[in-house]
Amino acid sequence: MASELPMFGQGAGVDRAACLPGAERCAGLRGLDLSMDALKQAQAPLRSAPTRPFLPQESPLSMLPCRLDRAADVRRSPVLAGATLIVRRLFIFVGTALLTLAGGYGMYDVVKVGGVTFLEALLLGLFLVLLAWVAFSFMSALAGFFVLLTRRQPNLPIDTTGPLPHVTSRTAMLLPTYNEDPHHVMARLRAMYESIDATGYGEQFDWFLLSDTTDPDIWISEEMAFIELRRACGGDQLYYRHRSDNTARKSGNIADWVTRFGAAYDHMIVLDADSLMEGDTIVRLVHAMERTPSCALIQTQPVIVNARTLFSRLQQFAGRVYGPLITAGNAWWHDGDGNYWGHNAIIRLKAFAAEAGLPELRGRKPFGGHILSHDFVEAALMRRAGWAIYMVPAVRGSFEEVPPSLLDFAGRDRRWCQGNLQHLAVLPTRGLHWVSRLHLLTGIGSYVTAPLWLLFLLVGLLISLQAHFIRPEYFPKGFSLFPTWPQQDPVLAAWVFAATMGLLILPKLLAYLVLISNREERTGFAGSGRVLAGVVCEAFVAALLAPCMMILQTKAVMEILAGRDAGWQVQRRGDGQLARGEVYRKLAGPTLCGLVLSVCAYSVSLPLLLWMSPVVLGLLLSIPLGIMTSLQLSAPGVFATPEINEPPAVVLRANELAAAEPTEMAGALRQLSRDPELLAEHLGSQSPASSRRFGPVDVPLATATAKVARCESLDDVLAWFDKLEMRAVLENPTLLRRILELPAGGRD
């Protein structure tokens, strides 16, 4: 809100000497009126009433930060695992343990020849940790194969084909956005609005576009697009809120809405800026919440759509083929102890507000501060209080998009990595369900395993280099004429390697078998032969990309451990086109690693280089792979999915709306000066300025106020103001009106 002014000196500073192109037309800051009277005048609440408010009447709902050092005050009856669920979990964990022990014993046989050295012991330890990770994923996939093949009833049955159920509760649809393309955001929102309206239950839903946008031009463009959306839909249930204080990012955005409007609703469905959901699916989720009062959250499995580049098509195909197997297996043994992915999920507001308020973590960034990966933690806190959390992979009609290139994916992965490593501070939270702790550990492990795999490769290479170049120093205790040379059994090592690769590849084959056993799915993919070709091609390209991702994730972990914060960058979407210089700069590291590994391996022997060729080749090809996979595909080819062959109605509608020519935007101030309706709506949406006499100084507002006094035209303002000052102007009705009263042209 405009009254929540930052402390003097916080945030990006204003360069008082640099007036840039407007320096000749505008005087410098020296001598400008920075008096308190001038600032008070700028902060005076002068507003113009809009034709229709951007927001409904507030209905506050208390949401306080929870305590991590004290167990929740559970007033609900605890959900206990039944015998069936215990057996399911024993299957997963006993199977994981047996596979790990068998593989570990095989690896011990490989290195024990001639005695186990320190490096060999380290290699064995790393192998056990990594194999346990692979085996755990394999067992969940095996469970998913059993569930899908036998078509077992899910833990939370939702009828996805019968008549639409009757719903009576009120649900808020929340779409947070941060510097996204307003035209595309509104296209998706309108497509979902129309889809729900077609069900006949449109009156039960209110829609909130929750903007954390910091770019002034995008902010005003959002308001303009929102007014057009309201005009097109006639929607009295469409609302827009811009938050000037971006505290806690997305989780803070949602929490702000809950505390202001949450009491008016029973549920909320949280979306991402790239989310799409069918109205039929949304109504069925609401009905499931109504008939399951013990449930706090139902998470759908979003299907990837609108993939246009090779990289995004790979993700779309893999997610569509392998995703159902993995999520079905997880849901089978998670039951009501599931997880939350942050979007495309329905949440009971009473449970969320009471239990999921997030505290700030102690310490400095990147480990301290606001919790970035909030979704896992929010689910764990609600589960701690006795609420059930369900994953429903069988529910269709939930969609999302993915980054279009390897570098965009790595950028998002960097933020997720920091958020997941923050969970190390959440793990000791008192009262968490053990499955919730496992979810947190799994998220941490998904990034920590990358440096562990790299370390495993390096230790293996060191053992080979040591045996080849360095005199042995491994003497047994007591007198001996001969040293203990590092030795391995190469034949057994090949078998252990093959078995490990089998655990990685077999889930893909199981997913393929499930798919071709379902006639509807097989037809949607245009035949089993085409799917098999896609599986083979996806596995090949993914194997080439995996070493590069290993290096990028290792770099991310190292940066976080060194205290480097990821910040909050805008998610790049669209066609995935990359500047060659950016690709060379960001993928030079993996390429150099591949060169070093290949030289070291070849210095030992050609067979060792061939043994390491899958890793070395992927690293050496990082740059061409980064470029090639970011190219657009004219046809889906073997990576076609049912959503490409026959796009769902809501996806078609969103794409149709997005393809329409957007309204031309002239820049924030010029657009407001030309559009009285937009100006009235913008002024009316602003919160009243604070009337307090003393307090922190808003530096951008202060400098903007001083500069306005020396500007004689709108052109002067546009030339001299930076984005922080422009944003301060847009948040201050009086100062904005003063600027818009200036003539358009500059001084002669």
Swiss-Prot record:
Q: Can you tell me which family this protein belongs to?
A: Belongs to the glycosyltransferase 2 family. OpgH subfamily.
Q: What is this protein called?
A: Glucans biosynthesis glucosyltransferase H
- EC number assigned by the record: 2.4.1.-
Write down the membrane topology. Multi-pass membrane protein
> What function is annotated for this protein?
Involved in the biosynthesis of osmoregulated periplasmic glucans (OPGs).
| Gene Ontology molecular function: any one | hexosyltransferase activity
* Cell location: Cell inner membrane
Q: What organism does the record attribute this protein to?
A: Bradyrhizobium diazoefficiens (strain JCM 10833 / BCRC 13528 / IAM 13628 / NBRC 14792 / USDA 110)
List each coiled-coil range: none
Query: Which terms are listed as keywords in the entry?
Result: Cell inner membrane, Cell membrane, Glycosyltransferase, Membrane, Transferase, Transmembrane, Transmembrane helix
Q: Which SUPFAM superfamilies match?
A: Nucleotide-diphospho-sugar transferases (SSF53448)
The UniProt entry, under InterPro entries, shows: Glucans_biosynth_gluTrFase_H (IPR023725), Glyco_trans_2-like (IPR001173), Glycosyltr_2/OpgH_subfam (IPR050321), Nucleotide-diphossugar_trans (IPR029044)
Q: Which GO terms describe its cellular component?
A: plasma membrane
Gene Ontology biological-process entries: glucan biosynthetic process
Main localisation, per the record?
membrane
Top-level taxonomic group: Bacteria
One Pfam family this sequence matches: Glyco_trans_2_3
Q: In which pathway does it act?
A: Glycan metabolism; osmoregulated periplasmic glucan (OPG) biosynthesis
- Residue ranges crossing the lipid bilayer per the database entry: 85-107, 127-149, 443-465, 494-516, 529-551, 587-606, 608-630
Q: Does the keyword Translocase apply?
A: no
Keyword Membrane set for record:
yes
